[in-house]
Amino acid sequence: MSEILELEAKSRNEFGTGAARALRREGRVPAIIYGAKKTPVSISLEEKEITKYYRKPAFISQLINLTIEGTQYKVLPKAVELHPVTDIVRHVDFVFLEDKTQKMEVPVVYEGKERALGVKRGGYFNIVKRRVTLLCDVNNIPRNVTIDVTNMPIATSLKSSKVKLPEGCSFTTKKEFVLATIIGRRGAKTEAEGEQTAEAAK
């Protein structure tokens, strides 16, 4: 199970644009928790703290223990609104963690893409999916999906059926999809094309 982040929050009872501006003047950010068939909870967070954590890798798949005036909630970030100029967090949506399984988006890490076999032979590594949606056991929530693509040849695609997911996780769709491809650049030949050319020359 991924490391759990501990955050403190305060409940809030005032809503609307004016109330949000007043919170931000105090250095706080409005937020809400919803989902899992529970009553939504409106809260506020310390702006500097939540912005600091947002800027760390894979925040959107970070499991969080959110303490609100003595009561703890296990939540996941769902959506983050940023200031258009400063990139400071302005609003956060969280979802309550489900009882058994959790649907969530996680980033995909393509390990070894710069030195992949197909790239060494002149190909270009093309990322189709930077994030994937998974259904995960709540006791084993991953921060990301890491795929070793070192041996991926040129002119091939990486399909979901070939990806080994973390234990307790599955894709939310059974339909096969492509996560990445290695595209041959002009002048680059696949191994099969090279063999055909050599055969024709005999």
From Swiss-Prot:
Record GO cellular component, one term: cytosolic large ribosomal subunit
Highest taxon of the lineage: Bacteria
InterPro entries documented for this protein: Rbsml_bL25/Gln-tRNA_synth_N, Ribosomal_bL25/Gln-tRNA_synth, Ribosomal_bL25_b-dom, Ribosomal_bL25_C, Ribosomal_bL25_long, Ribosomal_bL25_short, Ribosomal_L25_dom, Ribosomal_uL5_bac-type
Listed CDD domains: Ribosomal_L25_TL5_CTC
GO MF term list: 5S rRNA binding; structural constituent of ribosome
Key words, A-Z: Ribonucleoprotein, Ribosomal protein, RNA-binding, rRNA-binding
Subunit structure: Part of the 50S ribosomal subunit; part of the 5S rRNA/L5/L18/L25 subcomplex. Contacts the 5S rRNA. Binds to the 5S rRNA independently of L5 and L18.
Family the UniProt entry places it in: Belongs to the bacterial ribosomal protein bL25 family. CTC subfamily.
PANTHER family: RIBOSOMAL PROTEIN L25/GLN-TRNA SYNTHETASE, ANTI-CODON-BINDING DOMAIN-CONTAINING PROTEIN (PTHR33284), RIBOSOMAL PROTEIN L25_GLN-TRNA SYNTHETASE, ANTI-CODON-BINDING DOMAIN-CONTAINING PROTEIN (PTHR33284:SF1)
Cited function: This is one of the proteins that binds to the 5S RNA in the ribosome where it forms part of the central protuberance.
Name of this protein: Large ribosomal subunit protein bL25
Annotated organism of origin: Rickettsia bellii (strain OSU 85-389)
